[in-house]
């Protein structure tokens, strides 16, 4: 049986900076990865469609391999995937610090052609798409 569901969009990792200056481990995330994880609970016929950095392989790639998810439509375009450090304040608010430029984020967006290529030859039943609007 082939792929039936696509999770399209970005993946990103976060780490927490505590008040004492210490850092948590990097935590996998991003809307497309969360969607993929949820889909995978119900079926192995899922595929992640995204552009990312080569370092994704050590965490996201390993998770995908361990959970029987193909890496076929993950396009490595840069050295590092999107990452943020979140510094939490006593009131529960936080300040995100990106480890990339906005050009980086725009460059890694999933486009319609990426989705068409990922869906070719598949009988797609559903798709999740995470994509923010660009300013015009």
Give the label of every model feature segment.
Residues 1-18:
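Positively charged, low-complexity intrinsically disordered leader regions
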Residues 3-7, 28-32, 108-113:
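Short, composition-biased local secondary-structure segments
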Residues 7, 127-130:
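Redox-cofactor binding/interface segments in oxidoreductases and associated redox assembly factors
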Residues 13-21, 25-26, 43-128:
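Conserved N-terminal subdomain of the carbohydrate kinase-like
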Residues 21-37:
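Short catalytic helix/loop segments, enriched in acidic residues and glycine
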Residues 40:
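Gly/Ala-rich phosphate-binding loop of Rossmann-like dinucleotide-binding domains
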Residues 132-136:
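Short acidic/polar capping segments at secondary-structure boundaries
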């Amino acid at each position: 049986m082939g792929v039936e569901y696509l999770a399209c969009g970005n993946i990103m990792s976060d780490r927490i900076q505590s008040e004492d200056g210490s850092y948590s481990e990097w935590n996998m995330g991003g809307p497309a990865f969360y969607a993929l994880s949820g889909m995978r609970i119900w079926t192995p016929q899922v595929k992640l469609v995204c552009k990312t950095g080569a370092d994704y392989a050590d965490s996201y790639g390993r998770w995908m391999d361990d959970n029987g998810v193909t890496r076929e439509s993950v396009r490595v375009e840069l050295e590092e995937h999107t990452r943020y450090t979140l510094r939490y304040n006593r009131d529960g608010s936080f300040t995100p610090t990106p480890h990339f430029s906005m050009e980086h984020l725009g460059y890694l967006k999933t486009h319609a052609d990426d989705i068409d290529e990922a869906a070719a030859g598949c009988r797609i039943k559903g798709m999740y798409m995470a994509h923010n609007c660009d300013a015009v």
